């Protein structure tokens, strides 16, 4: 199975031929049959084929292109499957979104528009189609989707077949847990459409999935569900500091710090609000009101390193690559604006990890980990987590903390890491993000191409320069 780059052009032939293929491609595929099946996404038709000389373009009868809902005039890849005598165009990647505004064709996705433009730029350069759509845009019975694709510099609605794979970027946990979504995901599986990053991760589910795995347990802080006074009492008896975290929370929202002091107990929230209590009953009563019946977890407080009393953690982006294997794409240190959370969305800032580890402290016994250590831990935990969870995942934002003794702890795992442009630290001296595709966007598309049947080959390593022989 091999593929070649091409541009498909609509052309009304005078003969009965439906599809003209470059002669070089037909020789490469050893294609001699006068007819074959042409596929794009979920659509396929039989077509009569012939060859053309001196071109890498593919000419297609307009009625065939319309039956396939195949865009023309754009770079694509073509893959011939000899055992099925079929020609497949792609890769065709669908992105499931919560919403978009087609009335603003230059920025229909709001702050996520730059991300989608990056994806479209890569597709235009390497070949492929990207289509963003909502749940209600899909007609399963007809096998079509009405979504947004980029035409030039604007995004337009058009009808396409069901994609070869779907990347889940829904932002609503409630929508994702709906019966509609459950049925929708099952329809994807029934249609053999890879659907990755299947759902948001719950902190408790992550902890439960890893706590019984020997290779992961050493990196997990103690954690229990917050259900009663006894939970607070037991955790604060075992640990001087405990964090109450929303089980379904994100971006550092709703985190509360509980501390046992010589005078009683202290509760602190982001923003500087602090309250003291003489009894644990009073603390629990106030905490119960703050959590408002939402599922909360109690997590052991850790003596994490920081910079000038600013909490510091490390976000490691781990993604599946062009071979479907987990790999670390990027890592950044995040400094909190307050002493409770370090999330960038809550006013934090970023540093390169090497610089952060150099500036952070205090260290006990000089056991300072290296960035390579953090990468290795994040990679190991990602592999173990995917093995333990149901569903298909292709990227995790792994949040790690490092304590003063150099031990690495897992703080959180996010299956929908942010795609806004402010989540990567800029090189020193640069004030604006570079106008090139981020490695995370490239890797996501390479994995999507892989599951679509268009795995991208690695670039060959340059040969070492021949050594010059000195004449004596």
Tell where the protein language model's regions lie, with residue ranges.
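C-terminal active-site "lid" helix and adjoining low-complexity regulatory extension at the edge
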Residues: 353-393, 402-472
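Short Pro/Gly-enriched beta-strand edge/turn motifs at strand-loop
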Residues: 18, 294-302, 379-384
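Short, flexible/disordered intra-domain loops and linkers
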Residues: 101-112, 175-179, 421-433
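Conserved N-proximal alpha/beta basic substrate-recognition cap immediately N-terminal to
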Residues: 107-231
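Short hydrophobic beta-strand segments
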Residues: 89-108, 166-168
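A short glycine-rich, hydrophobically flanked beta-strand micro-motif that places a catalytic Asp/Glu
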Residues: 131-135, 297-301, 313-314, 387-405
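Short beta-strand-centered segments at strand-helix junctions
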Residues: 1-89, 97
């Amino acid at each position: 199975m091999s593929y070649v780059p091409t541009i498909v052009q609509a052309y009304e032939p005078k003969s009965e031929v439906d599809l003209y293929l470059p002669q070089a491609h037909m020789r490469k595929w050893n294609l001699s049959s006068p007819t074959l099946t042409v596929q794009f996404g979920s659509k396929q038709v039989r077509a009569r084929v012939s060859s053309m000389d001196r071109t890498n373009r593919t000419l297609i009868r307009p009625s065939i292109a319309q039956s396939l809902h195949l865009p023309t005039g754009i770079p694509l890849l073509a893959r011939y499957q000899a055992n099925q005598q079929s020609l497949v165009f792609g890769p065709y990647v669908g992105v499931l979104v919560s919403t978009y505004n087609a009335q603003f064709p230059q920025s229909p996705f709001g702050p996520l528009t730059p991300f989608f433009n990056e994806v479209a730029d890569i597709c235009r350069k390497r070949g492929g189609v990207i289509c963003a759509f909502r749940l209600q845009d899909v007609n399963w019975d007809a096998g079509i989707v009405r979504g947004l694709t980029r035409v030039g510099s604007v995004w337009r609605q058009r009808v396409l077949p069901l994609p070869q794979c779907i990347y889940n970027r829904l932002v609503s946990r409630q929508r994702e847990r709906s019966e509609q979504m459950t049925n929708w995901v099952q329809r994807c599986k029934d249609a053999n459409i890879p659907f990755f990053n299947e759902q948001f991760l719950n902190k408790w589910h992550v902890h439960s999935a890893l706590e019984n795995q020997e290779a992961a347990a050493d990196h997990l802080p103690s954690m229990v569900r917050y259900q009663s006074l006894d939970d607070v009492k037991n955790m604060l008896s075992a640990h001087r500091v405990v964090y109450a975290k929303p089980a379904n929370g994100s971006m550092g929202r709703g985190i509360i710090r509980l501390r046992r002091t010589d005078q009683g107990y202290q509760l602190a929230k982001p923003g500087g609000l602090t309250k003291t209590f003489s009894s644990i009953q009073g603390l629990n009563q106030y905490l119960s009101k703050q959590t408002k019946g939402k599922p909360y977890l109690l997590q052991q407080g850790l003596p994490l390193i920081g910079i000038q009393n600013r909490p510091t953690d490390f976000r490691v982006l781990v993604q599946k690559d062009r071979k479907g294997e987990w790999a670390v794409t990027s890592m950044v240190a995040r400094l909190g604006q307050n002493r409770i959370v370090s999330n960038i969305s809550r006013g934090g800032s970023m540093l390169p990890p090497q610089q952060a580890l150099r500036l952070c402290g205090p260290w006990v016994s000089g056991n300072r980990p290296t960035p390579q250590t953090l990468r290795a831990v994040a990679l190991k935990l990602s592999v173990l987590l995917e093995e333990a969870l149901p569903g298909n995942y292709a990227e995790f934002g792994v949040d790690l903390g490092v304590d003063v003794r150099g031990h690495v702890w897992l703080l959180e795992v996010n299956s929908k890491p942010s795609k806004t442009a402010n989540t990567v630290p800029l090189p020193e001296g640069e004030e604006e993000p570079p106008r090139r595709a981020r490695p995370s966007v490239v890797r996501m598309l390479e994995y999507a191409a892989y599951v679509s049947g268009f795995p991208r080959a690695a670039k060959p390593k340059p040969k070492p320069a021949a050594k010059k022989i000195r004449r004596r």
